[in-house]
């Protein structure tokens, strides 16, 4: 039961952060039916997953938001970005927006992966879209 409660708490925190993101940016969450997809080399329909999309200076921008930074999560999002840029052949930007890049008083180290155009906290993203 403790594990389930912990997962529910993380899910609730993530949903709350998505709501805050929408409130402060005015960008609404994407619906699954509107997300791009392609047929991969194995003949399987593959969805390119992200949370939000907007345009900045005429460029389509895809955003994934999360409460904490983890390198494995960035790897997943970098893969999505590469698929969007290479398989769907779309000129676009991909950003990962984190609630805070400081955890337990220490700044998180971010190594940007191929496909990603930026990993930043919400305040830096707000400055980007101004």
Residues covered by each model-derived region:
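Short acidic, S/G/P-rich loop/turn micro-motifs used as interaction or catalytic elements
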Residues: 67-72, 101-104
């Amino acid at each position: 039961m403790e594990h389930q409660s912990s997962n529910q708490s993380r899910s609730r925190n993530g949903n709350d952060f998505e709501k805050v993101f929408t409130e402060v940016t005015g960008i609404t969450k994407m619906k699954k039916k509107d997300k791009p997809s392609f047929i991969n080399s194995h003949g399987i329909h593959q969805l390119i997953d992200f949370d939000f999309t907007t345009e900045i200076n005429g460029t389509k921008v895809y955003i994934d938001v999360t409460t904490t930074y983890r390198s494995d999560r960035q790897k997943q999002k970098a893969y999505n970005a590469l698929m969007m840029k290479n398989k769907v052949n779309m000129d676009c930007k991909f950003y990962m927006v984190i609630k805070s890049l400081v955890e337990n008083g220490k700044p998180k180290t971010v190594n940007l992966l191929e496909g990603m155009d930026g990993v930043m906290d919400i305040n830096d993203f707000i400055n980007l879209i101004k």
